[in-house]
């Protein structure tokens, strides 16, 4: 009994224990994952021991902040400043942050931003669809590029598009063919990069059918950037994401440092990707190792260096900018200080870009997410949403073993993006039901139904793709932090794909209210999951799906 309890509580125990030691916050997550492997029970189907509930008694310490805390920051924000040890911290005014609510608003904003762009358009997505709405976007790009050439004083507009190679090359008409006219007409201004995972190579690449090769790994980042304005989202560039596929979107207006960071990030991934040519061929940047023909280790090292150089240089720039702005030379006159204050008002909101690229040994998002879940205190509320409910073991352990209340929003089978698909893909919603039921059963076996609640999103003729979380501190009716971007909190997001999201920390009541309304709008269309949910005829999972799910759950 004692051995079983230790194995069950192990992952959280080691995170708590390491939290008492000085050092990087990521060490807790790292040791927790090591404990996951060492403490795994050979009989994976056996229920976790109720001793898991003892894990919260090991109270964590707030991760050490190596940078000096800013006296201008509210005390409630201090607890998250450790994130800047890992990534750049961008302080902005909350008036520059707008939360979008609908696919139509997202689509219209993108078109409007493209039309007025003067310097740069940077778009990273899984793929670009081939329908009339997607063509509208391409036409907007073409028109804006044309105007930039005809202007009396050419603006030097540059367009950079990053997509996934496998998804963007599927079928005779695809993302590549949609973008070829732009490349052919504006070869000096347009760049199209197609990321190919280094894990799909050799015999595996030859044998896996086109429809399934994307399961090995993808470019999954979604960022849409226009001059100094940035949209972070989980939405792709496809018609359903512009009409009836619910996602999340945040618009950062006039944020040049953030725009520069994501431009450099997309450029970095683009540099290690295949470059689309005007004749629909692809080639690598000169001197770069090929992702699936070259040495895998050498390619991953080069990619790691390229991306980490962007992250680290931006982090240093922001630290210097922060010091110059808010910790200036005491010999400055009062007039100089006032003038500096006029140029850059004290921020009330902080943006942290969280990058996850496990193929390149970059796991910042994983570290930050695990630490946030570990630090969620008794009385805090975490609203976590994912279109594909398939949490990693580490995330599940933290949800079940920590003290915060959890409201987890997921897609009902009818609004799952694979619902009604042909062939094997049509069984994927049933596999998610099976995973959901297993998790719900575990919650019940631990007596956690009041603290951890599942809710299913449903909306007629819509699908659900929203992901992220909102954190409400104990005693607060509004969130002070949200995560928004591309990760789904599943195995793929952590281990296979390239992901990016941002943590938004704010003390602005107006922005907190925006985030709260966004959360309420999504959860308003949800129903609470109970044991009766799984008794419905539509929730009966075939035996073969139950048997196959453990084997394939790490691929979707």
From Swiss-Prot:
Please classify the protein's predominant subcellular localization into one broad category.
Answer: mitochondrion
| Entry-linked InterPro entries | PGS1, PLipase_D/transphosphatidylase
Where is ATP annotated to bind? 124-131
Tagged with keyword Transcription: no
Per the Swiss-Prot or TrEMBL record, the active site comprises 220, 222, 227
Q: Which GO terms describe its cellular component?
A: mitochondrion
Biological process according to GO: cardiolipin biosynthetic process
Which keywords are on file for this protein? ATP-binding, Lipid biosynthesis, Lipid metabolism, Mitochondrion, Nucleotide-binding, Phospholipid biosynthesis, Phospholipid metabolism, Phosphoprotein, Repeat, Transferase, Transit peptide
**Per its record, what are the GO molecular function terms?**
ATP binding; CDP-diacylglycerol-glycerol-3-phosphate 3-phosphatidyltransferase activity
Look up the record and name the pathway of this protein: Phospholipid metabolism; phosphatidylglycerol biosynthesis; phosphatidylglycerol from CDP-diacylglycerol: step 1/2
Query: Where is the transit peptide, renumbered to this chain?
Result: 1-28
Matching SUPFAM superfamilies: Phospholipase D/nuclease
Start and end residues of each PLD phosphodiesterase domain: 215-241, 419-457
Q: How is its activity regulated?
A: Activated by calcium and magnesium and inhibited by other bivalent cations.
Subcellular location as annotated: Mitochondrion
Q: Which residues carry this modification: Phosphoserine?
A: 49
Q: Name the EC number(s).
A: 2.7.8.5
Q: Give the matching CDD domains.
A: PLDc_PGS1_euk_1, PLDc_PGS1_euk_2
Entry annotated with the keyword Glycosyltransferase: no
Q: Which family does it belong to?
A: Belongs to the CDP-alcohol phosphatidyltransferase class-II family.
Which PANTHER family is this protein grouped with? CDP-DIACYLGLYCEROL--GLYCEROL-3-PHOSPHATE 3-PHOSPHATIDYLTRANSFERASE, MITOCHONDRIAL (PTHR12586:SF1), CDP-DIACYLGLYCEROL--SERINE O-PHOSPHATIDYLTRANSFERASE (PTHR12586)
Sum up the protein's function in the record's words. Answer: Functions in the biosynthesis of the anionic phospholipids phosphatidylglycerol and cardiolipin.
Protein's recorded name: CDP-diacylglycerol--glycerol-3-phosphate 3-phosphatidyltransferase, mitochondrial
| Gene, per the UniProt record | PGS1
